Regions:
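Short amphipathic beta-strand/extended segments in non-transmembrane regions
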Residues: 61-65, 79-137
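A hydrophobic alpha-helix feature that marks transmembrane segments and, especially
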Residues: 287-310
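Residue-level recognition of pore/gate-forming positions within transmembrane alpha-helices
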Residues: 28-33, 243
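Alpha-helical transmembrane segments
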Residues: 31-59, 305
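Generic structural signal for small/hydrophobic residues in well-ordered secondary structure
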Residues: 15-18, 37, 47, 63, ...
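Mid-to-C-terminal secondary-structure elements
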Residues: 101, 115-139, 147-283
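Membrane-helix entry/capping segments
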Residues: 1-24, 53-56, 68, 109-110, ...
Length: 310
Protein backbone atom coordinates (compact mmCIF):
# COMPACT_ATOMS: atom_id res chain seq x y z
CA UNK A 1 0.00 0.00 0.00
CA UNK A 2 2.87 2.38 0.84
CA UNK A 3 4.43 1.75 -2.56
CA UNK A 4 1.13 2.44 -4.30
CA UNK A 5 0.74 5.77 -2.49
CA UNK A 6 4.27 6.73 -3.48
CA UNK A 7 3.51 5.93 -7.12
CA UNK A 8 0.34 8.03 -6.99
CA UNK A 9 2.17 11.00 -5.45
CA UNK A 10 4.91 10.72 -8.08
CA UNK A 11 2.34 10.63 -10.88
CA UNK A 12 0.56 13.70 -9.50
CA UNK A 13 3.86 15.61 -9.31
CA UNK A 14 4.61 14.74 -12.93
CA UNK A 15 1.17 15.88 -14.01
CA UNK A 16 1.59 19.22 -12.21
CA UNK A 17 4.91 19.73 -13.97
CA UNK A 18 3.28 19.28 -17.40
CA UNK A 19 -0.16 20.94 -17.27
CA UNK A 20 -0.50 21.19 -21.07
CA UNK A 21 0.10 17.46 -21.47
CA UNK A 22 -2.29 16.71 -18.62
CA UNK A 23 -5.11 18.81 -20.09
CA UNK A 24 -4.65 17.45 -23.63
CA UNK A 25 -4.53 13.81 -22.53
CA UNK A 26 -7.52 14.24 -20.20
CA UNK A 27 -9.67 15.89 -22.88
CA UNK A 28 -8.85 13.25 -25.49
CA UNK A 29 -9.54 10.38 -23.10
CA UNK A 30 -12.78 12.00 -21.93
CA UNK A 31 -14.03 12.37 -25.52
CA UNK A 32 -13.18 8.76 -26.35
CA UNK A 33 -14.75 7.38 -23.18
CA UNK A 34 -17.94 9.43 -23.65
CA UNK A 35 -18.28 8.38 -27.29
CA UNK A 36 -17.82 4.70 -26.51
CA UNK A 37 -20.03 4.88 -23.43
CA UNK A 38 -22.83 6.41 -25.49
CA UNK A 39 -22.59 3.73 -28.18
CA UNK A 40 -22.53 0.84 -25.75
CA UNK A 41 -25.38 2.31 -23.70
CA UNK A 42 -27.43 2.45 -26.88
CA UNK A 43 -26.51 -1.17 -27.67
CA UNK A 44 -27.58 -2.22 -24.19
CA UNK A 45 -30.90 -0.43 -24.55
CA UNK A 46 -31.69 -1.66 -28.07
CA UNK A 47 -30.21 -5.15 -28.32
CA UNK A 48 -30.06 -6.43 -24.75
CA UNK A 49 -33.10 -4.67 -23.26
CA UNK A 50 -35.37 -3.62 -26.16
CA UNK A 51 -38.50 -3.82 -23.97
CA UNK A 52 -37.64 -2.49 -20.50
CA UNK A 53 -39.57 -4.13 -17.70
CA UNK A 54 -40.51 -7.26 -19.66
CA UNK A 55 -39.60 -10.75 -18.42
CA UNK A 56 -36.93 -12.80 -20.27
CA UNK A 57 -36.63 -10.64 -23.38
CA UNK A 58 -34.49 -13.25 -25.15
CA UNK A 59 -37.59 -15.38 -25.82
CA UNK A 60 -39.62 -12.51 -27.32
CA UNK A 61 -39.79 -12.26 -31.12
CA UNK A 62 -41.32 -9.86 -33.60
CA UNK A 63 -43.82 -11.65 -35.87
CA UNK A 64 -44.03 -10.12 -39.33
CA UNK A 65 -45.63 -10.89 -42.65
CA UNK A 66 -43.04 -10.41 -45.37
CA UNK A 67 -39.40 -9.46 -44.87
CA UNK A 68 -37.78 -7.13 -42.34
CA UNK A 69 -36.61 -4.66 -45.00
CA UNK A 70 -40.00 -4.41 -46.67
CA UNK A 71 -42.48 -1.65 -45.89
CA UNK A 72 -43.12 -1.88 -42.12
CA UNK A 73 -46.91 -1.74 -42.10
CA UNK A 74 -48.85 -3.53 -39.33
CA UNK A 75 -49.14 -7.01 -40.83
CA UNK A 76 -52.14 -8.80 -39.26
CA UNK A 77 -55.87 -8.48 -38.88
CA UNK A 78 -57.38 -9.30 -35.51
CA UNK A 79 -58.97 -12.49 -36.88
CA UNK A 80 -55.66 -13.68 -38.35
CA UNK A 81 -53.89 -12.83 -35.10
CA UNK A 82 -56.45 -14.84 -33.14
CA UNK A 83 -55.94 -17.92 -35.34
CA UNK A 84 -52.15 -17.69 -35.03
CA UNK A 85 -52.47 -17.29 -31.26
CA UNK A 86 -54.89 -20.18 -30.75
CA UNK A 87 -53.54 -22.76 -33.22
CA UNK A 88 -49.77 -22.62 -32.70
CA UNK A 89 -47.67 -25.09 -30.67
CA UNK A 90 -44.49 -23.01 -30.39
CA UNK A 91 -45.38 -20.01 -28.23
CA UNK A 92 -46.23 -19.44 -24.60
CA UNK A 93 -48.33 -16.57 -25.85
CA UNK A 94 -48.80 -14.14 -28.74
CA UNK A 95 -49.93 -10.54 -28.29
CA UNK A 96 -51.15 -7.84 -30.64
CA UNK A 97 -51.17 -4.07 -30.34
CA UNK A 98 -51.67 -0.86 -32.29
CA UNK A 99 -50.60 2.60 -31.16
CA UNK A 100 -51.63 6.13 -32.00
CA UNK A 101 -51.66 9.65 -30.58
CA UNK A 102 -54.82 10.66 -28.72
CA UNK A 103 -55.78 13.65 -26.61
CA UNK A 104 -56.02 13.50 -22.83
CA UNK A 105 -58.94 15.88 -22.29
CA UNK A 106 -60.92 17.04 -19.30
CA UNK A 107 -58.19 19.33 -17.97
CA UNK A 108 -57.25 22.94 -18.58
CA UNK A 109 -56.14 22.06 -22.10
CA UNK A 110 -55.90 18.84 -24.14
CA UNK A 111 -52.55 17.06 -24.14
CA UNK A 112 -51.38 14.50 -26.68
CA UNK A 113 -50.44 11.11 -25.26
CA UNK A 114 -49.27 7.90 -26.94
CA UNK A 115 -51.97 5.26 -26.50
CA UNK A 116 -51.76 1.57 -27.40
CA UNK A 117 -54.77 -0.64 -28.11
CA UNK A 118 -53.74 -4.10 -26.91
CA UNK A 119 -54.96 -7.67 -26.65
CA UNK A 120 -56.06 -8.80 -23.19
CA UNK A 121 -53.03 -11.08 -22.73
CA UNK A 122 -50.58 -8.26 -23.49
CA UNK A 123 -49.18 -7.72 -20.00
CA UNK A 124 -49.35 -11.39 -19.01
CA UNK A 125 -47.26 -12.56 -21.99
CA UNK A 126 -44.72 -9.79 -21.41
CA UNK A 127 -44.46 -10.84 -17.76
CA UNK A 128 -45.50 -7.46 -16.35
CA UNK A 129 -47.39 -7.11 -13.06
CA UNK A 130 -49.54 -4.09 -12.15
CA UNK A 131 -48.19 -1.58 -9.65
CA UNK A 132 -51.76 -0.74 -8.65
CA UNK A 133 -55.11 -2.15 -9.71
CA UNK A 134 -55.28 -4.80 -12.41
CA UNK A 135 -54.76 -5.39 -16.12
CA UNK A 136 -57.27 -6.48 -18.78
CA UNK A 137 -59.28 -9.71 -18.63
CA UNK A 138 -59.86 -12.02 -21.66
CA UNK A 139 -63.55 -11.13 -21.93
CA UNK A 140 -62.61 -7.43 -22.26
CA UNK A 141 -60.37 -7.91 -25.31
CA UNK A 142 -62.77 -7.02 -28.13
CA UNK A 143 -65.98 -6.34 -26.21
CA UNK A 144 -66.67 -2.66 -25.92
CA UNK A 145 -67.98 -0.84 -22.86
CA UNK A 146 -69.98 2.34 -22.54
CA UNK A 147 -67.11 3.61 -20.37
CA UNK A 148 -63.89 1.84 -21.47
CA UNK A 149 -61.13 0.71 -19.15
CA UNK A 150 -57.59 2.12 -19.42
CA UNK A 151 -54.21 1.45 -17.80
CA UNK A 152 -51.76 4.27 -17.08
CA UNK A 153 -48.01 4.15 -17.56
CA UNK A 154 -45.91 4.87 -14.48
CA UNK A 155 -44.63 8.09 -16.06
CA UNK A 156 -48.11 9.43 -16.87
CA UNK A 157 -49.33 8.44 -13.41
CA UNK A 158 -46.46 10.35 -11.78
CA UNK A 159 -46.50 13.48 -13.93
CA UNK A 160 -50.25 13.99 -14.39
CA UNK A 161 -51.73 12.41 -11.29
CA UNK A 162 -48.99 13.07 -8.71
CA UNK A 163 -48.45 9.35 -8.14
CA UNK A 164 -51.82 9.03 -6.40
CA UNK A 165 -52.84 5.35 -5.96
CA UNK A 166 -56.41 6.56 -5.60
CA UNK A 167 -56.58 7.24 -9.34
CA UNK A 168 -57.53 3.57 -9.83
CA UNK A 169 -61.29 3.44 -10.34
CA UNK A 170 -61.51 7.14 -11.17
CA UNK A 171 -62.86 8.57 -14.46
CA UNK A 172 -60.79 10.35 -17.13
CA UNK A 173 -61.46 11.71 -20.60
CA UNK A 174 -59.68 10.53 -23.75
CA UNK A 175 -60.61 12.43 -26.91
CA UNK A 176 -63.76 13.66 -25.10
CA UNK A 177 -64.84 10.09 -24.26
CA UNK A 178 -65.12 9.03 -20.60
CA UNK A 179 -62.84 6.18 -19.51
CA UNK A 180 -62.09 4.49 -16.19
CA UNK A 181 -58.60 3.79 -14.85
CA UNK A 182 -58.28 0.16 -13.71
CA UNK A 183 -54.53 -0.08 -13.22
CA UNK A 184 -51.07 1.47 -13.23
CA UNK A 185 -48.10 -0.21 -14.95
CA UNK A 186 -44.86 -0.63 -12.98
CA UNK A 187 -41.94 1.76 -13.20
CA UNK A 188 -39.70 1.09 -16.18
CA UNK A 189 -42.26 -0.59 -18.42
CA UNK A 190 -43.13 1.58 -21.42
CA UNK A 191 -44.68 -0.89 -23.87
CA UNK A 192 -43.77 -3.55 -26.43
CA UNK A 193 -42.63 -1.19 -29.20
CA UNK A 194 -38.81 -1.04 -28.96
CA UNK A 195 -37.56 2.50 -28.48
CA UNK A 196 -41.04 4.00 -28.07
CA UNK A 197 -42.90 4.94 -24.88
CA UNK A 198 -46.61 4.31 -24.46
CA UNK A 199 -48.46 6.52 -21.99
CA UNK A 200 -51.68 4.52 -21.77
CA UNK A 201 -53.16 1.17 -22.80
CA UNK A 202 -56.73 0.39 -23.90
CA UNK A 203 -58.48 -2.70 -25.26
CA UNK A 204 -58.79 -3.32 -29.01
CA UNK A 205 -62.33 -1.98 -29.39
CA UNK A 206 -62.78 0.14 -26.26
CA UNK A 207 -65.99 1.84 -27.39
CA UNK A 208 -67.59 -1.31 -28.80
CA UNK A 209 -68.11 0.26 -32.21
CA UNK A 210 -67.32 -3.03 -33.99
CA UNK A 211 -66.46 -2.34 -37.61
CA UNK A 212 -63.53 -3.69 -39.55
CA UNK A 213 -60.96 -3.73 -36.74
CA UNK A 214 -62.33 -6.84 -35.07
CA UNK A 215 -64.54 -8.34 -37.80
CA UNK A 216 -62.63 -8.21 -41.12
CA UNK A 217 -59.63 -10.29 -42.15
CA UNK A 218 -58.55 -7.79 -44.78
CA UNK A 219 -58.09 -5.06 -42.17
CA UNK A 220 -54.43 -5.41 -41.23
CA UNK A 221 -53.68 -3.18 -38.25
CA UNK A 222 -52.11 -5.25 -35.46
CA UNK A 223 -48.41 -5.47 -34.66
CA UNK A 224 -47.72 -8.96 -33.30
CA UNK A 225 -45.15 -10.17 -30.75
CA UNK A 226 -44.70 -13.73 -29.48
CA UNK A 227 -42.94 -15.42 -26.58
CA UNK A 228 -41.30 -18.71 -27.57
CA UNK A 229 -41.77 -21.82 -25.47
CA UNK A 230 -38.59 -23.09 -23.78
CA UNK A 231 -36.55 -25.19 -26.20
CA UNK A 232 -38.32 -23.91 -29.34
CA UNK A 233 -36.11 -22.13 -31.89
CA UNK A 234 -37.17 -19.20 -34.06
CA UNK A 235 -36.92 -21.47 -37.11
CA UNK A 236 -39.30 -24.05 -35.62
CA UNK A 237 -41.77 -21.36 -34.57
CA UNK A 238 -41.51 -19.77 -38.01
CA UNK A 239 -42.49 -23.05 -39.69
CA UNK A 240 -45.36 -23.49 -37.24
CA UNK A 241 -46.84 -20.07 -38.04
CA UNK A 242 -46.22 -20.53 -41.77
CA UNK A 243 -48.32 -23.72 -41.68
CA UNK A 244 -51.16 -21.92 -39.91
CA UNK A 245 -50.93 -18.95 -42.28
CA UNK A 246 -51.20 -21.23 -45.32
CA UNK A 247 -54.42 -22.68 -43.92
CA UNK A 248 -55.78 -19.17 -43.32
CA UNK A 249 -54.92 -18.04 -46.86
CA UNK A 250 -56.50 -21.17 -48.35
CA UNK A 251 -59.70 -20.55 -46.39
CA UNK A 252 -59.88 -16.80 -47.10
CA UNK A 253 -57.97 -16.16 -50.36
CA UNK A 254 -59.71 -12.88 -51.20
CA UNK A 255 -58.56 -11.34 -47.92
CA UNK A 256 -54.89 -12.28 -48.41
CA UNK A 257 -53.78 -11.03 -51.81
CA UNK A 258 -50.37 -9.71 -50.72
CA UNK A 259 -47.30 -11.34 -49.18
CA UNK A 260 -48.22 -14.04 -46.69
CA UNK A 261 -44.85 -15.45 -45.66
CA UNK A 262 -44.00 -15.20 -41.95
CA UNK A 263 -40.73 -13.78 -40.62
CA UNK A 264 -39.62 -13.93 -36.97
CA UNK A 265 -36.88 -11.61 -35.74
CA UNK A 266 -35.40 -10.57 -32.39
CA UNK A 267 -37.26 -7.65 -30.84
CA UNK A 268 -34.36 -5.23 -31.35
CA UNK A 269 -34.81 -5.66 -35.12
CA UNK A 270 -38.55 -5.00 -35.05
CA UNK A 271 -39.45 -2.35 -37.66
CA UNK A 272 -42.47 -1.33 -35.56
CA UNK A 273 -40.46 0.69 -33.06
CA UNK A 274 -37.73 3.30 -33.14
CA UNK A 275 -34.98 0.67 -32.84
CA UNK A 276 -35.83 -0.98 -36.15
CA UNK A 277 -35.03 2.17 -38.09
CA UNK A 278 -31.72 2.57 -36.23
CA UNK A 279 -30.54 -1.05 -36.42
CA UNK A 280 -28.81 -0.52 -39.77
CA UNK A 281 -26.62 2.21 -38.25
CA UNK A 282 -25.22 -0.12 -35.57
CA UNK A 283 -22.12 -1.30 -37.53
CA UNK A 284 -21.33 2.31 -38.47
CA UNK A 285 -21.58 3.49 -34.85
CA UNK A 286 -19.37 0.63 -33.65
CA UNK A 287 -16.77 1.44 -36.32
CA UNK A 288 -16.77 5.14 -35.41
CA UNK A 289 -16.43 4.37 -31.70
CA UNK A 290 -13.53 2.00 -32.37
CA UNK A 291 -11.77 4.57 -34.58
CA UNK A 292 -12.18 7.31 -31.97
CA UNK A 293 -10.74 5.03 -29.28
CA UNK A 294 -7.78 3.96 -31.43
CA UNK A 295 -6.98 7.54 -32.48
CA UNK A 296 -7.16 8.70 -28.87
CA UNK A 297 -4.81 5.96 -27.72
CA UNK A 298 -2.39 6.81 -30.53
CA UNK A 299 -2.48 10.54 -29.70
CA UNK A 300 -1.95 9.99 -25.98
CA UNK A 301 0.94 7.62 -26.75
CA UNK A 302 2.50 10.24 -29.04
CA UNK A 303 2.17 12.95 -26.38
CA UNK A 304 3.71 10.67 -23.77
CA UNK A 305 6.62 9.82 -26.06
CA UNK A 306 7.31 13.48 -26.83
CA UNK A 307 7.12 14.42 -23.15
CA UNK A 308 9.63 11.75 -22.23
CA UNK A 309 12.05 12.99 -24.91
CA UNK A 310 11.93 16.61 -23.76
Amino acid sequence: MRGLLQDVRFALRQLRKNPAYTVAATVMLAVAICANGTVFSWIDGTMLHPIPGARDMSSLVSVMRGQWNSSPTPPFSYLDYRDLRDQNHSFEGIIGYHHDWLALTGGAKPERIYVANVTANYFDVLGVKPLYGRFFRPEEEAAGRSIPYVILSYSLWKTHFAGDPGIVGKPLEIARHPVTVIGVAPKGFVGAAPGLRHDMWMTLDPLGTGGWRTTERSGNWLVVVGRLRPGVSREQANQDLETIMRRIVAAYPNDHLGTNTITLDPMWRSPFGANGYMASTLPILLAIAAMVLLLTCANVATLTDRKSNV
